């Protein structure tokens, strides 16, 4: 069921929800394939503009997450040349999300019991937000796998003190951190696990103190390394509280109503979330600590979370577990028929309204980008640098299969920096002005392609 749901429109071009971020991620993989060389220390992507970092990025450096996922995908794509990059990248995300479902089952079975584990895995499998973000070309599906895997293995280590589980937990945590340093907000979960087993003298085991040091050495080394490429480091200070929204009424509304209640739970699913408060047992410590980590994450990364809903991927596992646990609490506390009726109604309505929110995410809003991009790919040299104005949105540039600029203006400056082609889906003043000066390769109702290296006589 989980696989079938995730295959819905998996052949979408990179032009659905958050296409700009997907395009940036996918283009790192594509540049590796094009270069026929996988240099993990110097990842490059399509955008040569100064939009991300404030500095011209003519080498196209992309210094964000450590690109081991992109490198792995590129290696497979280079080996099997008939594979479509976008389709395969989406499929890889789907497959890793299937493994995350297995890990959630194993983790919850250890903390609670098999019944809650099965239900948590099911909720994670069918939650509309989870389904959509399990087939995107982003680091998030991999981050969720490695972070939950690390927690699971750490729980096993705390329980049995096995070296294998300890080492696997470090590896999982290190890889998660290399993708998203936000994994640090899951620290309360690790601390709660330690507390649960503190009577077994786990606090005297030096390995628990070494674990965060060993796990975070790679990301600290990566962060130090990328300082050598300032033009490839996107500005990130704004993520914290760039617009001053932290703890304001709008912050509460966006994160807890618009996202959690509306987008994740479809309004009605919040009944299951609240039902968790009716049952307190030893497992609640770990789950409550997980929610504490979520709250700290929302407070610290305030603007980032409000601005982009994909930042809430981090909370998916605990949301799924809490929905499942709340459902079982209702089943336990109420009479069988009443509980069944409530569960069916709340689940059905919650899924319906959440799906209604998410289905629009699959829509392609700019088919003209696809058409224009294909035309550029067929007409111009493979190494041509392209200006594809979309107000900085890189999804249009991605469709051209070329590097370049996702924004117009200062065209002469861009030509001096190597721009060869101008393609636009808006026949605006800029396109008209360039049409007067340079040779037009194609002009249709949907787009215009101009050769910036061929001036009219």
Briefly describe each language-model feature range.
Residues 75, 82-111, 149, 153:
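Transmembrane-helix motifs of polytopic, lipid-linked glycan transferases
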Residues 25-35, 175-178, 184-283, 294-308, ...:
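Transmembrane-lumen/periplasm boundary regions of multi-pass, lipid-linked membrane glycan transferases
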Residues 110-115, 150-168, 176, 200:
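Membrane-interface transmembrane helices that cradle and orient dolichyl/undecaprenyl
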Residues 362-366, 376-426:
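Short periplasmic/luminal acceptor-recognition loop of GT-C membrane glycosyltransferases, typified by
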Residues 1, 171, 213-216, 280, ...:
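Signature aromatic-anchored transmembrane alpha helix within multi-pass, membrane-resident enzymes
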Residues 132-142:
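Short acidic/glycine- and proline-prone juxtamembrane loop motifs at membrane-interface regions
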Residues 2, 120-125, 173, 177, ...:
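Short helix- or helix-capping micro-motifs
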Residues 13-28, 36-51, 61-73, 83-87, ...:
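Extracytoplasmic catalytic/substrate-binding loops of multi-pass membrane glycan-assembly enzymes
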């Amino acid at each position: 069921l989980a696989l079938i749901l995730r295959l819905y429109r998996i052949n979408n071009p990179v032009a659905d929800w958050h296409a700009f971020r997907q395009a940036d991620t996918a283009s790192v993989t594509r540049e590796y394939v094009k270069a026929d060389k996988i240099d993990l220390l110097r990842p490059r992507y399509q955008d040569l503009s100064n939009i991300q970092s404030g500095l011209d990025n003519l080498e196209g450096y992309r210094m964000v997450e450590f690109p081991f996922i992109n490198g792995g995908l590129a290696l497979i794509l280079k080996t099997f040349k008939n594979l479509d990059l976008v389709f395969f990248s989406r499929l890889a995300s789907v497959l890793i999300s299937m493994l995350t479902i297995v890990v959630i089952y194993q983790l919850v079975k250890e903390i609670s019991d098999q019944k809650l584990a099965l239900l948590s895995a099911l909720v994670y499998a069918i939650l509309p937000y989870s389904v959509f973000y399990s087939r995107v070309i982003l680091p998030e599906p991999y981050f969720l796998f490695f972070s939950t895997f690390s927690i699971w293995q750490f729980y096993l280590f705390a329980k049995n003190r096995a070296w294998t589980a300890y080492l696997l937990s470090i590896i999982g945590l290190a890889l998660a951190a290399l993708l998203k340093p936000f994994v640090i907000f899951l620290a309360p979960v690790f601390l709660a696990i330690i507390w649960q087993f503190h009577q077994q003298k786990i606090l005297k085991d030096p390995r628990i103190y070494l674990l965060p040091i060993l796990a975070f050495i790679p990301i600290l080394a990566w962060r130090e390394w990328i300082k050598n490429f300032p033009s490839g480091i996107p500005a990130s200070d704004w993520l914290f509280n760039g617009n001053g929204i932290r703890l304001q009424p709008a912050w509460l509304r966006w994160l807890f109503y618009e996202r959690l209640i509306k987008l994740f739970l479809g309004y009605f699913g919040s009944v299951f979330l609240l039902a968790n408060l009716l049952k307190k047992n030893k497992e609640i410590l770990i789950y409550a600590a997980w929610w504490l980590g979520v709250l700290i994450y929302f407070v610290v990364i305030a603007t980032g979370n409000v601005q982009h809903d994909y930042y809430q991927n981090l909370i998916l596992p605990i949301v799924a577990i809490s929905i499942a646990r709340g459902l079982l609490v209702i089943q336990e506390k109420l009479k069988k028929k009443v509980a069944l009726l409530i569960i069916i109604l709340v689940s059905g309505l919650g899924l319906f309204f959440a799906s209604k929110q998410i289905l629009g995410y699959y829509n392609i809003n700019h088919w003209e980008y696809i058409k224009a991009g294909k035309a550029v790919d067929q007409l111009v040299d493979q190494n041509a640098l392209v200006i594809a104005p979309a107000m900085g949105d890189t999804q249009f540039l991605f469709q051209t299969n070329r590097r370049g600029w996702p924004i117009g203006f200062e065209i002469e400056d861009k030509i001096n920096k190597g721009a060869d082609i101008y393609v636009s889906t808006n026949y605006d003043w800029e396109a008209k002005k360039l049409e007067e000066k340079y040779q037009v390769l194609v002009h249709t109702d949907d787009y215009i392609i101009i050769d910036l290296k061929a001036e009219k006589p």
